[in-house]
Amino acid sequence: MIYHCEDHTCNYWDEGEKLPERCPQCGRKLLRANEADMTGDDWTALGNTLWDAEASDKKRMVDCFRKAAYLGSAWGVCNLGICMEQGNGVEADPVQAFWLYQQAVEMGSLNAVCCLGVCYEHGIGTAPDAKQAAELYRKAAEYGSPRGQMLLAHAFHDGIGVEADAAEAVHWVRAAAYQRYGEGMYWLGVCYEYGDGVEQNWEHAVHWFREAAESGVSAAMADLGYCYEKGCGVEQSWEQAFSWYRRGAECGNLRSMHNLGWCYEKGCGVEQSWEQAFSWYRRGAECGNLQSMHNLGYCYEKGYGVEQSWEQAFSWYRRGAECGNPVSMSNLGLCYKRGYGVEQNWQEAIKWYEQGAQCGDLQSMHNLARCYERGEGVEQNEDRALYWYRRSAEGGNGGAMYNLGRCYKMGHGVEQNWQEAVKWYEQGAQCGNLQSMNNLAYCYEYGEGVEQNEERALYWYRRGAEAGSDYCMYCLGWNYSNGEGVEQNMTEAIRWYTAAAEGGNADAMHDLGWLYDHGEGVEQDMKKAICWYERAAEQNCPAAMNSLGECYAMGRGVPRDLETAMEWYRRAAELGEAMADYNMGWHLEQAGKLSEAYAHYRKAADGNDDSAWWALGRFYENGVVVAQDGKEARRCYETGEKLGSVKCKMRLARCKLLGIGGRRAKKAGLDLCRQALELAKESSEKEDYGYEAEMNLLRRTIAENES
């Protein structure tokens, strides 16, 4: 049964087994049609309804257009040509489509004029002829066809069959827009957005985007949402942005689907929901949106809104990469590099990094540079590494800026240049790269490549700390603890050490443990001290291992256990902790294992441990294990004194008084001994480092030589 709306201006036609009560377009009454009385345009209107219905019989649609054409409907002939061109309901036949368009043009169809012009422009069913296409577009445009006006605007914009003229293009876009043609209103908004053929004006852009969006143009909905998101030509409003993105997404606009997912991901204009974000990313990805494919892969990678799956992440990164998304290429390369969701394959990783880099993706450039620097999946090549670090850095990648600065610092692939290193650290830091902030602060602190400036160092340590760098948190805590570049403040020191420690910084864990151990800036708490020492030791922090050894050796916070202490010392010493070697030497000396003690003292001294030089000096002074040698003893004490050892200072003063290893200077020696003794008293009041025995020795020496 065929039926139509009683309102002929509505022109709704359809067919079915039953007659519905109301027209779905205007709500008026539907009337049963008599096929014998139907005109060609009636059959075309029925065919159009079947065209728009997803589940309709497309062959029946073509039959309707054939009947329309037979009855002399130019509209029907043109639509039959479109079916032939697209292969919709019939096998595609471009030549037949071209002929049908010609017939429809002769019958007066303006749409057919446009279709024929498109055939000439793209060579559909005929040889390409841009000039002929432009003439047909102009004919349709001048007769008032909004589609023709847009096609002519496109020709003037891109110089197709006519000389390019942006202003003339806008003239015809405006003509279509003033006819309330959706595409015309949208593109007029785009022209105002970019200042293309017209002076840039965001307010006008918003006006035409709104007009087009309200007429149902989904692309305009996406652009209007963007204007609200950024506050361009309209007061910024995430709620309005979200609303328009939703409308665009529900109308099938892929960009809107992605942006809607992003709103749900970030909680912008709507309550945050990873599940909703994932849902819209999936819809966009399945419809072919590259950004949605990438974000869907990211959701699977992190398990956001869906169960974590590297296999699914890899699959979507691959789809995005193969469709040309450079960011997906970078992530796909990472999957191959790490073996995430796929068997590890360095060659594939390099391949995708190179493709992403060639497409302009900054992270791909950065990753490729790292591979060249390390020789991962490709022959090591510092020149190529530097090239890609520079390309990425100059494009704005903060990580590449840091690594380029590091290359200049180390002289990798380029002559060492601290000034260039600082320049790139500065740029990386300004871009928010934490490692750049770390290194820039270090350069200011120690005057490397830039004039030393504690204030600037502290500024960047603070910036890095507030941005989440555990290393900067640690350095900031250290500055507050030691009053370096800032007034000493143990409360602030504890705060930043704690933040750094909880962020995983092993040095901060150790120093925080040390403060709890010695009750500095905080109430002494050996339980917390041991806890932080152990956490740092688990991360192979040698200083923490040594401190644990000291706690076990002295029974401080744990039961005294010399065997466990020596094990911790051994582990710390193997990692290069000189103080641990000294501590091992001390305990071995007390146990009478003098040769072993000497070996550890020597190793500790080579690591610049000041107490080890004191111990070595004693061995040489007294001829323990080694031949007695006053000069060597004196040299050891001098070295230790320069490193800050108070015990070495006392021994050196005694050597000068007694003439050990050099000329005796009684008066000057006595003065030095008294000065050293006073310094030792002050130091011993702060911390007992075994000063008492040395102080007693010095007192006896002074007493014996004063008479």
Label the predicted regions.
Residues C5-D7, C23-C26:
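Short cysteine-rich clusters marking metal-coordination/redox-active sites
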Residues G27-A36:
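Short Cys/His-rich micro-motifs in 6-15 aa windows
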Residues M38, D52-A53, Y70-A74, Q86-N88, ...:
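Short helix-capping/linker turns of helical repeat alpha-solenoids
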Residues M38-K67, L71, I82:
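Alpha-helical segment of the N-proximal tetratricopeptide repeat
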Residues W43-A53, V77-Q86, V113-H122, L151-D158, ...:
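Hydrophobic face of amphipathic alpha-helices that form TPR/SEL1-like repeat modules
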